[in-house]
């Protein structure tokens, strides 16, 4: 098994309800270490760039508006097969289809306010981490 790093965003629906600690507890219970974390307000331009892959999708505008509606917590997680493990603890995008005990089943309000984002591949994780963190901020 390989030690990996992955990127996470706890979305405004989590920060607005003061659930950051509860979500972090699930992350750590899954065996992942939070090696970098900061609370930020992202700009519309940052949200559009981050989610550019979805720019042609009908939900793009709503996604961007949701992401800039309040603070987010950006994180770097580290552990054995971190990308796969975090995707499992996240749960399905649609919280109604997510397994019990996952972040989205326990905390998401809807598909649009689904509490968290996680990288889907090592290449994506590397790009997303570099977009939000300098190398000296990763203190695993």
From Swiss-Prot:
<dbReference type="GO" id="GO:0006228">
    <property type="term" value="P:UTP biosynthetic process"/>
</dbReference>
<feature type="binding site">
    <location>
        <position position="59"/>
    </location>
    <ligand>
        <name>ATP</name>
    </ligand>
</feature>
<keyword id="KW-0546">Nucleotide metabolism</keyword>
<feature type="active site" description="Pros-phosphohistidine intermediate">
    <location>
        <position position="117"/>
    </location>
</feature>
<dbReference type="InterPro" id="IPR023005">
    <property type="entry name" value="Nucleoside_diP_kinase_AS"/>
</dbReference>
<keyword id="KW-0547">Nucleotide-binding</keyword>
<comment type="similarity">
    <text>Belongs to the NDK family.</text>
</comment>
<comment type="subunit">
    <text>Homotetramer.</text>
</comment>
<keyword id="KW-0963">Cytoplasm</keyword>
<keyword id="KW-0597">Phosphoprotein</keyword>
<dbReference type="Pfam" id="PF00334">
    <property type="entry name" value="NDK"/>
</dbReference>
<keyword id="KW-0479">Metal-binding</keyword>
<keyword id="KW-0418">Kinase</keyword>
<feature type="binding site">
    <location>
        <position position="93"/>
    </location>
    <ligand>
        <name>ATP</name>
    </ligand>
</feature>
<dbReference type="GO" id="GO:0004550">
    <property type="term" value="F:nucleoside diphosphate kinase activity"/>
</dbReference>
<dbReference type="GO" id="GO:0005524">
    <property type="term" value="F:ATP binding"/>
</dbReference>
<comment type="function">
    <text>Major role in the synthesis of nucleoside triphosphates other than ATP. The ATP gamma phosphate is transferred to the NDP beta phosphate via a ping-pong mechanism, using a phosphorylated active-site intermediate.</text>
</comment>
<dbReference type="GO" id="GO:0006241">
    <property type="term" value="P:CTP biosynthetic process"/>
</dbReference>
<feature type="binding site">
    <location>
        <position position="87"/>
    </location>
    <ligand>
        <name>ATP</name>
    </ligand>
</feature>
<keyword id="KW-0808">Transferase</keyword>
<keyword id="KW-0067">ATP-binding</keyword>
<dbReference type="InterPro" id="IPR036850">
    <property type="entry name" value="NDK-like_dom_sf"/>
</dbReference>
<dbReference type="GO" id="GO:0046872">
    <property type="term" value="F:metal ion binding"/>
</dbReference>
<feature type="binding site">
    <location>
        <position position="104"/>
    </location>
    <ligand>
        <name>ATP</name>
    </ligand>
</feature>
<dbReference type="InterPro" id="IPR034907">
    <property type="entry name" value="NDK-like_dom"/>
</dbReference>
<dbReference type="GO" id="GO:0005737">
    <property type="term" value="C:cytoplasm"/>
</dbReference>
<protein>
    <recommendedName>
        <fullName>Nucleoside diphosphate kinase</fullName>
        <ecNumber>2.7.4.6</ecNumber>
    </recommendedName>
</protein>
<dbReference type="InterPro" id="IPR001564">
    <property type="entry name" value="Nucleoside_diP_kinase"/>
</dbReference>
<feature type="binding site">
    <location>
        <position position="114"/>
    </location>
    <ligand>
        <name>ATP</name>
    </ligand>
</feature>
<dbReference type="GO" id="GO:0006183">
    <property type="term" value="P:GTP biosynthetic process"/>
</dbReference>
<keyword id="KW-0460">Magnesium</keyword>
<feature type="binding site">
    <location>
        <position position="11"/>
    </location>
    <ligand>
        <name>ATP</name>
    </ligand>
</feature>
